[in-house]
């Protein structure tokens, strides 16, 4: 090649990024790495040298704004104004207006971008900005557009497009509003990028984990299977040409030229670039090639099925870790994929629909076959929708043009219309993957003016859902009018004081609300709380006051509390603080009384005391005493210890003095006999019982006092001992023998009725009276032992609030009142209050009008139940006529005053206009009489000679199926929601794009709204029932019929009578891959009658779907990834089956096994005549597949470490260390690259001669071959995979090869050289 004789040819061409790629690729393919590096280096030097010379940089003068920008914007503004006018006239709905505005701006933006480029190209091709962007050095067209065109439409944080575009560019500068809108979108971009990197990194990690053990292990697995490769298309566009998909593949069968039957490629031949181009030129649509998906090599992929290594453009080496390369190739572009597509509110560009334009002026003819129905486009324009395929004919001057109209096309012309050249005739949807699918969306419409509602042509229909909520839906669309007027919101409970048709002046009362008292009582004006909206009036319905007792504030331990002192010298603690509320039965105060306080714990006995039965349950409060008597109290000191027995310093039954340390750190306070309770060497409690001790000789006496009993004064205890006072005699075991203990008893007397301070109560109404009652409550029951060291209160005397009604729960306020005679003295008062809230006067507030409130009572006045306390009036703000009070409706919530300025008077001769009568509604722009058009929309009020009075109104278009929020003749305030428009918004392709979609595919997730799939092939019939439900019947070849009910909102994508295949989608939406696999498997098992083949075929279908779906996501973002990478990953996801029935094999139902493992085991079973295993193929997501690998070390290092390891331990698994990850973790040489074959079993045969005479121990210490040992084995016995390249003498020089290098369309080496697109 170097010695070629011909002189080099010089070509003067522009070489941009794409050409550069090709140049380097070409050099690499023909001359290898070293020379390519030199060429690249030289190019770099050249580039830098000239970049330095040229000094290209952007200055503000380089940003040239095209002169035609102003007129472009002007025409756009004009179109938008027209749209706004149509909206104001009620010709289009809010949604259609929005769509039209967005589309107008999007088109303007595109048009402007083209002008910018054209402007540069024609007037200043050496402009720095232009050169940078178009050579691919820096920047792209959309950035240039923002610099010198317009910034365009931005999305708000919810992803909806803001219909105010940024019309300026960065050169001119943004206005404040534009700047804020602009930063919305910019921030969103940044956040997206930040989220994207994390997501993408995790995706890469999962991919690496699932495929890390795929290594090229053998040369040829010998399979005859393969995949058919065809060009990848999207509608009419070719995304990936067949030549590009074939490059670097190995053919599975011979490729023949269809026209000449010449053999283009043998079976098993790898396809290089020339061959790929020849196949494409020959017009071959499908080629069967080997693929990692069909490779039969166990646990890996063979060289032939993988094909070229794309880095070297030659067959892949043995031991190449293709799994990891695949994972990185898919994961790396992840960051470039957009996270979410902006929900553009249905802005879609021209790619989803082809516009048919008239080539010449002429007349339209729709033939006899044309089946169309009227259709309203998304911009609210009237058009026709084709219901079947037919031809549209345009007859021009001397020529006839025919256009094929497909079903579903939108036709913008009628039969017989005359059209100009370049007029748009129709919009033909593009068939193929991007079906123009729709989703339901809603939009609220709020009114711009207050007034009265009128329906015109709207037929409302009430629908009740399962929960019983009623919604009103417009069955027929029409206009919803709002007739202007001043609307007043009435306060709750207000009654109108005027009638429809009354004339009112400013300040007249329109409605009033009366505030009444429910129970009556004494009026007390609250202090003014300073609130601007209301004040409170209190009505005291009942009260009680302690008229002789005084209340004092005392401070104890730094806390202030109140004490009530009675004339009798009793002192009560006030428990409820002043200003709080207490309910019936609540304790208000408690007597301060030390008579019933003990020194220590002890035993309590009742003598004649009775307690209330019902109080027993409420032991929290204590037990209420119903009859007085005496309490008998036998003191004893109890320590609850719960410590180790070794800490005890005294013995059971020992006599101790007060102050003795009975247990470590515990001292007793009384003198007496110790009683110790212990349990399992744990000291539970110590009781010290005081009293007189007597030694007992007689065991009978001991038995008599064993339980302990009361001995009255003067009674004989035992012979020779008489009790001097009331005692409690109890026998105890002393340290030296039995003792009798006589314990002192204290007697406490309880009176029948506790003393109560005098009280004076005032009752306003007979129904309520309240008083304070004194209650004595015992804290402990008869015979209870109180374990305590300190003293306890045995009885409390409390003041409790009571009401006559007994049952009802009243709440009273506690207040302190200064005495009327002596202001220094405070008295306790309890009052029951009914609060009445009175609104303040509000100066003319927008919705209520002026309210004026007047009080009808004075402080201290007594009022009867039902008396009016205050009255609030709504006053008129502007003179006019009252309207809109609906007769017969329950409560009137709003009323309307029609003012002078809500009407306009037109001077015209009305006699000519016959169609006008009072009450008819006219849209602005309507011709009233010849030459006079209505300036405003409105309702005809009155017709007088020479005059027409219009009431201003505003029409809103309501589409069919919208949800109505208002009723006919109802009243609305400005800003109220009138209607919720339900519309269909076009989506292009899948809504989920980018990373989330890839993740959904590779994790094999069930899509949210999956489509309905046909389970068996047949002919589809579509039945529409009454309630919009659709039923699809598929009638199979043998006449069986399957029903598929379709839910609401699932658009069909098949037509009536169409033939469908098994697994074909009947409705729109992404397919659920799991269902698809199941459907295919059932179908093929029936067709082929063999499980293994059926599983392979069904898996192959799902694999193809996954590969294409992933490819299409990357393609839509303009990223090229070779199919084989995706195939390697998908192979790992689809290699397992679930066992349904183990048969006679050792497999268990529910286990996951490799398909070929099960196949081999079933073959063995067949030979021996035993039952094979039944199985179903499964599709595993990448995470699940990673956790189900054979290597537990790899799985555990990925996720759920503990679960994986415990499972492996229980099953006693061994890890064969086949993948890279396991070996890395253990620290061995990885079995790829140079380490490949170091661990192959075959090595044991060809060991180096020098090793043969060694004698080895039978039980080697280390089973794992060590790296050092592995090195000494001969590794050069394998095949030689390097290849030499020679070039024929006549091959062309580098710049001499005609069009090949510079031609854009040949995407020859795009795959080989991965240069970053950005």
From Swiss-Prot:
Keyword check for Transport: no
Binding positions for Zn(2+) per the UniProt entry: 221, 295, 302, 305
Keywords from the named record: DNA-directed RNA polymerase, Metal-binding, Nucleotidyltransferase, Transcription, Transferase, Zinc
Keyword Metal-binding in record: yes
Pfam families in alphabetical order: RNA_pol_Rpb1_3, RNA_pol_Rpb1_4, RNA_pol_Rpb1_5
Top-level enzyme category: transferase
EC id: 2.7.7.6
GO terms, biological process: DNA-templated transcription
GO cellular component: DNA-directed RNA polymerase complex
Positions in coiled-coil regions: none
CDD domains to which the protein is assigned, alphabetical: RNAP_beta'_C
Catalytic activity: RNA(n) + a ribonucleoside 5'-triphosphate = RNA(n+1) + diphosphate
Cofactor: Zn(2+)
GO molecular function: DNA binding; DNA-directed RNA polymerase activity; zinc ion binding
Cofactor annotation remark: Binds 1 Zn(2+) ion per subunit.
Family the entry assigns: Belongs to the RNA polymerase beta' chain family. RpoC2 subfamily.
Functional summary from the UniProt entry: DNA-dependent RNA polymerase catalyzes the transcription of DNA into RNA using the four ribonucleoside triphosphates as substrates.
Assembly and oligomerization: In cyanobacteria the RNAP catalytic core is composed of 2 alpha, 1 beta, 1 beta', 1 gamma and 1 omega subunit. When a sigma factor is associated with the core the holoenzyme is formed, which can initiate transcription.
The protein's name: DNA-directed RNA polymerase subunit beta'
Source organism (scientific name): Synechococcus elongatus (strain ATCC 33912 / PCC 7942 / FACHB-805)
């Amino acid at each position: 090649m170097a010695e070629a004789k011909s002189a080099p040819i010089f070509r003067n061409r522009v070489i941009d990024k794409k050409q550069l790629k090709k140049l380097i690729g070409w050099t690499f393919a023909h001359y290898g790495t070293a020379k390519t590096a030199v060429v690249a280096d030289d190019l770099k030097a050249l580039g830098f040298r000239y970049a330095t010379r040229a000094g290209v940089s952007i200055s503000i003068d380089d940003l040239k704004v095209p002169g035609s920008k102003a007129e472009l914007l002007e025409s756009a503004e004009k179109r938008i104004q027209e749209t706004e006018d149509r909206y104001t006239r009620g010709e289009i709905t809010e949604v259609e207006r929005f769509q039209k505005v967005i589309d107008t701006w999007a088109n303007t933006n595109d048009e402007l971008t083209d002008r910018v480029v054209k402007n540069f190209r024609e007037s200043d091709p050496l402009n720095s900005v232009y050169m940078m962007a178009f050579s691919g050095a820096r920047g792209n067209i959309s950035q240039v557009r923002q610099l010198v065109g317009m910034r365009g439409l931005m999305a708000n944080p919810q992803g909806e497009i803001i219909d105010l575009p940024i019309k300026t560019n960065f050169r001119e500068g943004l206005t404040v509003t534009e700047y804020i809108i602009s930063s919305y979108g910019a921030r969103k971009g940044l956040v997206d990028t930040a989220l994207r990197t994390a997501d993408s990194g995790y995706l890469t990690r999962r991919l690496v984990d699932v495929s890390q053990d795929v290594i090229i292990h053998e040369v040829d697995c010998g399979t005859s299977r393969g995949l058919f490769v065809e060009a990848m298309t999207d509608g009419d566009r070719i995304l990936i040409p067949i030549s590009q998909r074939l490059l670097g593949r190995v053919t599975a069968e011979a490729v023949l030229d269809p026209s000449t039957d010449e053999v283009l490629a043998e079976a098993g031949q790898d396809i290089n670039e020339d061959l790929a181009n020849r196949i494409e030129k020959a017009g071959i649509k499908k080629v069967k090639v080997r693929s990692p998906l069909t490779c039969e090599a166990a646990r890996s992929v063979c060289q032939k099925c993988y094909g070229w290594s794309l880095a070297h453009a030659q067959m892949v080496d043995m031991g190449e870790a293709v799994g990891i390369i695949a994972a990185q190739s898919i994961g790396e572009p992840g960051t470039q994929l957009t996270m979410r597509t902006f929900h553009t509110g249905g802005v879609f560009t021209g790619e989803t629909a082809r516009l048919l334009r008239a080539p010449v002026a002429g007349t339209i003819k729709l033939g006899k076959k044309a089946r169309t129905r009227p259709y309203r486009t998304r911009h609210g324009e009237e058009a026709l929708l084709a219901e079947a395929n037919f031809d549209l004919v345009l007859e021009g001057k001397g020529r006839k043009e025919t256009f094929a109209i497909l079903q579903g096309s939108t036709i913008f012309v009628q039969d017989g219309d005359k059209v100009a050249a370049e007029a748009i005739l129709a919009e033909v949807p593009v068939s193929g993957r991007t079906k123009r699918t729709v989703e339901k969306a809603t939009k609220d419409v709020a009114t711009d003016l207050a007034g009265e509602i009128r329906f015109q042509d709207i037929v409302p229909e009430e629908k009740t859902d399962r929960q019983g909520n009623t919604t009103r839906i417009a069955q027929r669309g029409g206009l919803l009018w709002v007739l202007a007027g001043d609307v007043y919101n009435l306060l709750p409970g207000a009654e109108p004081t005027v009638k429809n048709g009354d004339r009112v002046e400013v300040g007249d009362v329109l409605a009033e609300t009366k505030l009444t008292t429910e129970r009556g009582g004494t009026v007390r004006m609250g202090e003014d709380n300073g609130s601007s909206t209301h004040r409170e009036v209190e009505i005291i319905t009942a009260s009680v006051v302690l008229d002789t007792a005084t209340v004092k504030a005392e401070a104890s331990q730094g806390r202030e509390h109140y004490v009530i002192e009675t004339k009798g010298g009793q002192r009560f603690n006030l428990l409820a603080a002043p200003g709080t509320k207490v309910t019936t039965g609540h304790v208000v105060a408690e007597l301060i009384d030390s008579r019933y306080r003990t020194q220590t714990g002890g035993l309590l006995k009742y003598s004649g005391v009775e307690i209330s039965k019902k109080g027993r349950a409420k032991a929290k409060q204590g037990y209420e005493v119903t009859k007085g008597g005496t309490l008998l109290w036998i003191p004893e000191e109890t320590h609850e210890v719960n410590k180790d027995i070794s800490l005890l310093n005294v013995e059971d039954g020992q006599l101790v003095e007060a102050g003795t340390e009975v247990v470590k750190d515990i001292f007793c306070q009384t003198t007496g006999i110790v009683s110790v309770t212990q349990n399992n060497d744990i000291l539970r409690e110590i009781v010290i019982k005081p009293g007189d001790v007597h030694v007992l000789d007689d065991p009978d006496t001991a038995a008599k006092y064993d339980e302990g009993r009361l001995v009255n004064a003067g009674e004989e205890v035992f012979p020779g001992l008489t009790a001097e006072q009331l005692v409690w005699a109890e026998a105890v075991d002393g340290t030296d023998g039995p003792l009798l203990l006589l314990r002192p008893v204290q007697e406490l007397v309880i009176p029948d009725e506790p003393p109560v301070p005098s009280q004076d109560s005032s009752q306003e109404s007979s129904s309520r009276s309240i008083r304070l009652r004194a209650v004595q409550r015992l804290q402990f029951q008869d015979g209870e032992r109180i374990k305590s060291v300190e003293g306890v209160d045995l009885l409390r005397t409390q003041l409790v609030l009571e009401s006559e009604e007994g049952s009802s729960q009243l709440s009273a306020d506690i207040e302190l009142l200064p005495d009327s005679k002596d202001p220094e003295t405070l008295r306790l008062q309890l009052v029951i209050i009914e609060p009445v809230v009175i609104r303040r006067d509000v100066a003319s507030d927008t919705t209520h009008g002026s309210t004026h409130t007047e009080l009808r009572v004075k402080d201290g006045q007594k009022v009867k139940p039902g008396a009016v306390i205050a009255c609030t009036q709504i006053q008129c703000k502007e003179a006019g006529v009252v309207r809109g009070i609906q007769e017969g409706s329950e409560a009137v919530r709003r009323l309307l005053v029609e003012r002078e300025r809500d009407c306009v008077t037109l001077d015209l001769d009305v006699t000519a206009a016959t169609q006008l009568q009072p009450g008819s509604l006219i849209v602005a722009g309507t011709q009233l009489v010849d030459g006079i058009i209505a300036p405003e929309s409105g309702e005809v009020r009155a017709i007088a000679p020479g005059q027409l009075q219009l009431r201003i109104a505003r029409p809103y278009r309501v589409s069919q199926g919208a949800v109505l929020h208002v009723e006919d003749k109802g009243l609305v305030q400005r800003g109220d929601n009138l209607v919720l428009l339900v519309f269909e918004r076009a989506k292009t392709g899948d809504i989920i794009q980018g990373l989330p979609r890839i993740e959904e595919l590779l994790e094999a997730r069930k899509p949210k709204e999956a489509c309905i799939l046909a389970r068996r092939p047949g002919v589809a019939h579509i039945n529409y029932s009454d309630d919009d439900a659709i039923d699809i019947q598929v009638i199979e070849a043998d006449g069986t019929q399957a029903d598929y009910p379709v839910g609401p909102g699932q658009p069909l994508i098949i037509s009536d009578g169409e033939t469908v295949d098994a697994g074909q989608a009947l409705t729109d939406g992404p397919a659920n891959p799991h269902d698809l696999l199941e459907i295919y498997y059932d179908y093929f098992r029936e067709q082929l009658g063999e499980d293994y083949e059926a599983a392979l075929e069904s898996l192959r279908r799902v694999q193809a779907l996954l590969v294409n779906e992933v490819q299409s996501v990357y393609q839509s973002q303009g990223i090229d990834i070779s199919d084989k990478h995706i195939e390697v990953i998908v192979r790992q996801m689809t290699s397992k089956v679930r066992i349904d029935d183990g048969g006679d094999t050792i497999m268990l139902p529910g286990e996951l096994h490799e398909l070929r493992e099960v196949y081999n085991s079933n073959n063995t079973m067949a030979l021996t005549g035993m039952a094979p295993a039944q199985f179903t193929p499964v599709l595993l997501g990448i995470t699940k597949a990673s956790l189900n690998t054979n290597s537990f070390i790899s799985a555990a290092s990925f996720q759920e470490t503990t679960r994986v390891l415990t499972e492996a331990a229980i099953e006693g698994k061994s890890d064969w260390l086949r993948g890279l990850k396991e070996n890395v973790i253990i620290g061995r040489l990885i079995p790829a690259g140079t380490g490949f074959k170091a661990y192959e079993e075959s090595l044991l045969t060809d060991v180096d001669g020098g090793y043969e005479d060694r004698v080895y121990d039978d039980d080697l210490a280390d089973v794992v071959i060590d790296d050092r040992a592995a090195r000494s084995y001969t590794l050069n016995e394998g095949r030689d995979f390097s290849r030499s390249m020679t070039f024929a003498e006549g091959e062309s020089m580098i710049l001499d090869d005609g069009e090949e290098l510079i031609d854009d369309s040949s995407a020859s080496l795009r795959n080989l050289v991965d240069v970053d697109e950005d």
